[in-house]
């Protein structure tokens, strides 16, 4: 995790790879700059994290002598995305750095909420701030893992309806995502882990809010979680055209 004590917030800077700066540990050159599309998704993710926790994120312009705590860039390679956890390379500057596959440039730049690329941005940033896969045994020293079963999909909550960090589309599912249904944001177990690590933002959605078919994207199946810190709220699905499952479990 970032910081020295659980439950505490902090300021974290992030920067986009610039060709005037360097990634000394990469196996291939980072020669493609981020476009506005993926930058917007990344900013949305950091805004979401700030609304959930006491973390504050700020964008830093890279120079040869100055880079963010978290660095993001495109890199050629077999994986669509990869991230160094904050404690994985504690003696180096690698912790928190993220790269996305250059060959999928067009897809990253056109990513939309609920698709594979949008979810992968959130997933990799999740790793960078200290979340592990629920099926992993804790490869990063400070990463928080829900459950301890190493078989993908066999854990009762190892599924995307509970955590964006899961590789399973549904409970009991194996490795792989559903083509048309992915978590749109950090899910309930992710939020519990994040708030344990970095505290809860109790100023988010404290009024009387309405959530439902008038405010959510409904053109395909989706999974989402709402963090609401107070007020008298309403979930309204009167205008929905798809069947829904609403889970109010604490």
Residue locations for each model-derived region?
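Zinc-dependent metalloendopeptidases
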Residues: 1-250
């Amino acid at each position: 995790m970032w910081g020295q004590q659980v439950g505490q917030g902090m300021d974290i800077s992030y920067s986009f790879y610039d060709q005037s700066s360097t990634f000394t540990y990469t196996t291939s050159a980072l020669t493609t700059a981020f476009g506005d599309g993926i930058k917007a998704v990344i900013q949305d993710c950091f805004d979401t994290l700030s609304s959930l926790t006491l973390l504050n994120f700020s964008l830093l312009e890279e120079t040869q002598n100055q880079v963010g705590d978290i660095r993001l860039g495109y890199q050629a390679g077999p994986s669509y995305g990869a991230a160094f956890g904050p404690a994985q390379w504690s003696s180096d500057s690698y912790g928190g750095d993220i790269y996305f596959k250059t060959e999928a440039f067009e897809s990253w730049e056109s990513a939309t909420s609920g698709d594979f690329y949008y979810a992968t941005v959130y997933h990799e940033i999740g790793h960078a701030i200290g979340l592990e896969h629920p099926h992993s045994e804790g490869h990063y020293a400070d990463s928080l893992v829900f459950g301890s079963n190493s078989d993908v999909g066999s854990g009762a909550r190892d599924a995307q309806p509970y955590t964006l960090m899961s590789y399973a589309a549904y409970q009991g599912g194996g490795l792989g995502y559903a083509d048309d249904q992915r978590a749109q944001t950090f899910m309930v177990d992710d939020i519990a882990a994040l708030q344990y690590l970095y505290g809860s933002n109790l100023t988010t959605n404290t009024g009387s809010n309405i959530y439902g078919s008038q405010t959510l994207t409904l053109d395909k199946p989706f999974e989402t979680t709402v963090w609401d810190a107070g007020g008298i709220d309403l979930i309204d699905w009167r205008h929905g055209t798809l069947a829904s499952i609403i889970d109010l479990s604490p």
